[in-house]
Curated annotation (Swiss-Prot):
The keyword Ribosomal protein belongs to this UniProt entry's keyword annotation: no
Pfam families: FabA
Gene3D superfamilies recorded: Hotdog Thioesterase
Membership in a protein family: Belongs to the thioester dehydratase family. FabA subfamily.
Catalytic residues (UniProt): H69
Name of the protein in its database record: 3-hydroxydecanoyl-[acyl-carrier-protein] dehydratase
Catalytic reactions of this protein: a (3R)-hydroxyacyl-[ACP] = a (2E)-enoyl-[ACP] + H2O; (3R)-hydroxydecanoyl-[ACP] = (2E)-decenoyl-[ACP] + H2O; (2E)-decenoyl-[ACP] = (3Z)-decenoyl-[ACP]
GO biological process: unsaturated fatty acid biosynthetic process
Amino acid sequence: MQKNAYTFEELLACGRGEMFGPGNAQLPAPPMLMFDRIVRIEAEGGKYGKGYVEAEFDIRPDLWFFDCHFIGDPVMPGCLGLDAMWQLVGFFLGWSGGPGRGRALGVGEVKFTGQVTPDIKKVVYKIDLKRVIMRKLVMGIADGVLEADGKVIYETSDLKVGLFTPEQMA
């Protein structure tokens, strides 16, 4: 039986390649791992019934990006929130049994209506899978949002992530 939630320690193990087997999906290691835990993952959940992932990221003023983006005007780069959503789609594909290493393939649309600053306490990512392909091509297509302290500030449509075997990447 698959787990439906993962701790930070388990996410680190995934980053070392210990969760889905050698050559399969891995999360990045910190500081590029952009969430602290997956609080819910479901194969048939979400608004499209194709899968759902929800993860949380505890925001602290000492996070690495606040010191350099920007000096005197600290804000989490929007691309890091977007990357977190790609990370979660890739995790979902590995969790679902897809073979290969994850690669972001694109996004249809991204909309930012707010920012993550050091005074934010928690970011929540919510990913709704729209399509999951598990053939020679392993790919997930999803919509995602980022909530900062309960308010949606990033919205994405058609996040695309594929899993690729070494032969496919050659």
